[in-house]
Amino acid sequence: MPTVSPTPTPTPTPTPTPTPTPTPTPTPTPTAEPIVLPTSFENLFERRKGISLAAWQKSSEVIKASKNKSGAFEIITGPNTTPNFDDYPTPISLVSRLFPARSEPAKTIVIRYKYVDLEWAETTLRSKLTAEEFTQLNRNEGGKAIAGRCDVSSRNCRGAMQQTTIAGLSLIIQGVPNEVDKSDPTSKLRFGSGMLEAHEYFHSLQRIPIMGAEVWPHAWFREGSAEWVQNMAVNYNDYKTYQEFLAIDCAGHCARLSEADIVEFLEKSKENYTPPNFDPGLNYNLSSRFIEALVALKGPDTLINIYEQMGKQLTFEQAFKNTYGVEWSYALPILAKTIYANLKD
């Protein structure tokens, strides 16, 4: 018989010892630097990142703690006009609550119209005023109280204005555009959220302390205040949208200015005068940034206090010192430097 060779027993292959997986080093989550709120002109520039939050927080708290005290409203809309925004009481009540200690008109008449209703608006305005009141109002508006809100060439009405009669009746003449201007990034919010309504109504609060005094703060203060108030009132519960509007509102002309330009704008602007080398729109968009800084330091009521002071025949410079505690000549370069830096950051 053949000899059977034994089957060799295989040598076991040693199991490799697993290499331990190194424990990953945790990447620390970056800690956002806390926003420090400005408290004075002395630290306004250093704490400029906190300006928006300070102004918004102070004002939001006022609105939430206050009640609406606005007077009666008569809102008249042209027969062929459909407004972009039709909840008039809401923005009005928010402006009222932002200024709880301030007087408001006992009655406001609002006339809203598209270009197609131009003649209707003229007739309606005449029917609501005495002949003397209409003449005075039309004279104040260069004979174009109604037509002045519209552009004849494009047959479109985008303007609005507020006036107060000698008897204290508040009038808001409000052109309604045929369509929202898609080339203007602010149009959707301005015409569709209640901002325009808040803006014009605030002008009526400005007028009350200076009725009969024939004095006005600088144009940038007047319109910058209304531009800031419209944003604050509508967005008192939405800080993100408040910030977004600030950014897009100033993304054009004001973003291209140098610090020296801003100083010149503030130095040369007067009651109803804007230096000819500056776009009049700066009285609104850029100037709302100055106003925001002032509110961040001293609160929203100061915007009317300036008018109250000037109603006593004080100059803007005197009223500013009484309200904000420093000379206007001292505050001006600080505001210019601060706002310029925030626009560039």
Sequence positions of predicted segments:
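Acidic/His/Gly-enriched intrinsically disordered linker/tail segments
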Residues: 212-287, 297, 307-345
